[in-house]
A protein has these predicted regions:
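N-terminal topogenic module of multi-pass integral membrane proteins
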Residues: 353-400
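Hydrophobic alpha-helical transmembrane segments and adjacent interfacial helices
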Residues: 374-385, 405-409, 427-443, 461-464
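Short amphipathic alpha-helices and their capping loops
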Residues: 1-14, 82-137
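Helical lid/core segments from catalytic subdomains that handle acyl or acyl-like groups
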Residues: 132, 199-281
Length: 481
């Protein structure tokens, strides 16, 4: 009612072959599912996780343990069991809420002026499916060039990404800066062994159109930004600013539905302050005996904009672009910039099962039904006007279509929890009965006949659902009440 929460689940994870598009939804409202999934495809092991459980560091640690145990089972004769993490770590350490531990309500807050960033224009109709573009390069090559220019690899890649975006901008778009969101692992700044979310972010960017638009100019500006904003004091300020909202005594007890709407509105506004995202997962390390069986690690995230994720294993730096746009020009520009710097970039074809596509059939059925309802209302009104202009029988047709559409729409939205769906249908159909009774001249049939019969029908439906799905009293009693 007031906040989201995680609860223990008796569901057992099932490892299966990859069967849907990467980064598909794991959290489905009203449906009891695990918030992570392990699948495989050919020689690749996939670990997908919902961000509420952990961040990139926690996900990487889990994947390392998963791969280690898999390799040990396969090559038990050649491998020795090893500990990847600190043997003295406890579950309490790993479940520590480090945000709360380092939160300081008295930390001085600095007001930051909000700047609208340039937004990447869609080159046509945006894809609903996640577009993935992968490449790899030598860590030594890239690191050598970064050292020549006296910057870190993160700074070099950030500058290249900003310039790649700029090449697709018009003169009008240059009025706004290109701003990237770059997540920061706070464990490197504030000591923590937590596997829960513990990250912040910085927003390096560049204002083009001022005459100094070369790669070297951008690189110098990004280098300076990183130096100024990756300090402990600056990251603490950002962290405290965000946690203060969660800790607010009044907001804490605001209804969840109101919070969700405010969060969505805030997220929509925040989107205007960022052009794209660059996430550097840093180095993934494995014991030498195990590393010989591993080719590379890779990472990518679901996104509504363009995002670049980076991680390295041995001498291979893996780059993964994800977006829902139909253009790959930015990716092409990025690879070309790195090639011109002297880095050999190998673009790899994303390899996924052919049938691993998102399923939008239910959504399409609802869209077709919506169109049919609107068409029926329009046709009835036209017929009414032409044939019998003084009768207005089309009002009843429109009301009937609206009733059917609303009932089906709620049924579609609540389809993952049949008991909750039934409870909603009880309220909706009862309300519709009363409205129809009022609209046709109150006779009381809705209260005397309609609602009692609907209640009886819903009770029977709930009983059947509970029996078929073998639900425990804890799961269905609340709906009976």
């Amino acid at each position: 009612l007031f906040w989201h929460y995680l609860e223990k689940s008796e569901l057992r994870p099932v490892v299966r072959e990859e069967y849907k598009e990467p980064c598909s939804s794991l959290y489905v409202r009203d449906k009891k599912t695990l918030l992570f999934e392990v699948t495989y495809y050919k020689k690749r092991i996939n670990f997908e996780v919902f961000h509420a459980l952990t961040d990139g560091t926690g996900a990487t640690e889990f994947l390392r343990e998963l791969v280690k145990n898999y390799l040990y089972l396969i090559h038990e004769e050649d491998l020795e069991p090893v500990e990847l993490s600190n043997q003295y770590l406890t579950v309490k350490d790993q479940e520590d809420d480090s945000f709360s531990r380092y939160y300081d309500p008295d930390f001085p807050r600095k007001k930051k002026k909000k700047i609208r960033a340039v937004q990447i224009k869609k080159g046509g109709k945006g894809y609903e499916e996640l577009q993935i573009n992968e490449a790899s390069m030598s860590v030594k090559e890239l690191l050598g060039i970064a050292r020549e220019k006296k910057v870190s690899m993160s700074v070099l890649l950030t500058a290249a990404f900003i310039c790649a975006i700029h090449e697709e901008m018009s003169r009008m778009q240059e009025k706004k800066p290109v701003i990237l969101m770059v997540p920061v692992n706070l464990r490197k700044i504030f000591p923590s062994d937590s596997m829960l979310n513990f990250f912040g972010y910085i927003e390096p960017g560049y204002q083009f159109g001022g005459g100094k638009d070369s790669f070297e100019d951008v690189l110098e500006a990004v280098k300076l930004y990183f130096q100024e904003n990756l300090s402990k004091e600056h990251m603490a300020g950002r962290m405290n600013e965000l946690i203060a909202i969660e800790k607010h005594k009044i907001l804490k007890w605001a209804p969840l539905e109101l919070k969700n709407r405010c969060i969505r509105a805030g997220a929509k506004m925040a989107e205007q302050e960022v052009t794209a995202v660059l996430s550097n997962m840093s180095v993934v390390k494995m014991p030498e005996d195990y590393a010989q069986y591993i080719e590379k690690f890779g990472v990518y995230t679901s996104t509504n904009r363009t995002e670049l994720c980076i991680c390295s294993f041995k001498d291979t730096l893996s780059l993964s672009f994800t977006s829902r746009y139909d253009s790959t020009n930015i990716q092409r520009n990025f690879y070309r910039i790195l090639t011109e710097l002297g880095v050999q970039v190998t673009v790899t074809e994303a390899d996924f099962p052919e049938d691993a596509k998102a399923n939008y059939e239910g959504k399409k059925v609802l869209q077709i039904f919506t169109f049919c309802c609107i068409a029926a209302i329009v046709l009835s009104m036209m017929t009414d006007i032409i044939i019998s202009p003084g009768v207005h029988w089309s009002v009843y047709v429109a009301s009937g279509c609206a009733t059917m559409w609303f009932t089906m729409a709620v049924g579609y939205v609540k389809r993952f929890n049949l008991l909750k769906n039934a409870a909603w249908q009880l309220l909706i159909m009862s309300g519709i009965c009363v409205l129809w009774d009022l609209g046709t001249g109150w006779r009381g049939w809705s209260v005397n006949i309609g609602i009692p019969n609907i209640c009886l029908l819903i009770q029977i439906v709930m009983l059947i659902i509970s029996r078929i799905r073998s639900l425990s009293p804890r799961e269905y009693m609340i709906y009976y009440v």
